[in-house]
Amino acid sequence: MPRLTLQHPIRTLDNQPLYSAGSLLTEETLDTVIDTDKVDSYQTYPLLLYGSIKEDCLNFLSIPPYTTIFSDKKQINDLLNLSETVHFSIPVLQSLDYFKQHDLYTYSHVLMVFVLSTLLAKDLIPDYQGRVQLSATGPTHDIGKICVPVQILKKTTPLTKTERSFLEHHAAAGYVLLGYYYKNTQHLACKVALDHHERRDGSGYPRGIPLKDPLVEIIAVSDIYDALIMPRPYRSGAYDNRTALEEVTGMADQNKVGWDVVKALVAHNRASRPDYREVTVSTEKRGTPPSYNVYGVVTEETGPKDKTG
């Protein structure tokens, strides 16, 4: 269970304060915060019937390399049919509205992590209900970014130490927000939001613990891959698909993520669609990353210290 001292505050989209900076986040303190909510339960709505989400998903799927991964129309229909069973609370759906208006990078990212993880889950999770459960976590894994200033999310130059800590804050913030809305700190979406940046070797954040949950790992790998192949403000362009797959393969070789989910991703990038268990993956690197990329680069503070509370 988490035990974190929060560096920054956590508020809902309607500016309801849940935690102040410096607060201790534990399951017990979150239960107390949940009890303060006067709403017993939030109305839910099917994700793909909300706004333009279904249309937007299909548009994003028409962008390479997703055109290769999702070239089978039946596969897309099966995915959409499963996705139509997934419902979200209105505050969660409103977070997607927020990202669509203020940060299209994050908006497209959470939708593509949703569809890609749902596809990979079909190979890796034999239980249908398990796949539905995982599918419901894709669009919410980055909900904590509503607590990160938009100028940080869109920054094109290296982040300062304070800005980097704000960005990493989104994992804990997502755990809190989803626990608050679902009234359940044990919900899989809460775990995914908190742990999708953890790694098998313990090198991730926010807790630096070994990632052991295979469901969370499907989201984690989908998250990494989409972030590489799509444009981002902090680099000169997207990774080409070969280089992106080499990066993800390299992470498996370093025991940061597991081989099964990486092989499933590679299998869907091959025209023959082999069984992921029969995929052979080369660890040789021949791709070329973008020439300008400041992801992970931290620079000196240039302005007044952060005093957010």
Predicted regions and their residues:
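Residue-level signature of transmembrane alpha-helix interfaces in integral membrane proteins
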Residues: 157-158, 233, 239, 274
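Terminal helices and disordered tails flanking the catalytic cores of nucleotide-processing hydrolases
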Residues: 1-93, 238-309
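Alpha-helical scaffolding flanking metal-ion-dependent phosphate/phosphodiester catalytic sites
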Residues: 113, 136, 140-147, 165-176, ...
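Acidic/His-rich, divalent-metal-binding segments that scaffold phosphate/diphosphate chemistry
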Residues: 42-168, 180-185
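Short alpha-helical linear motifs
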Residues: 154-163, 192, 213-217, 265-270, ...
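Residue-level signal for pocket-adjacent positions within structured domains
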Residues: 5, 13-14, 91-94, 147-148, ...
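Short glycine-/small-residue-rich flexible loop motifs, especially phosphate/cofactor-binding loops
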Residues: 30-31, 118, 175
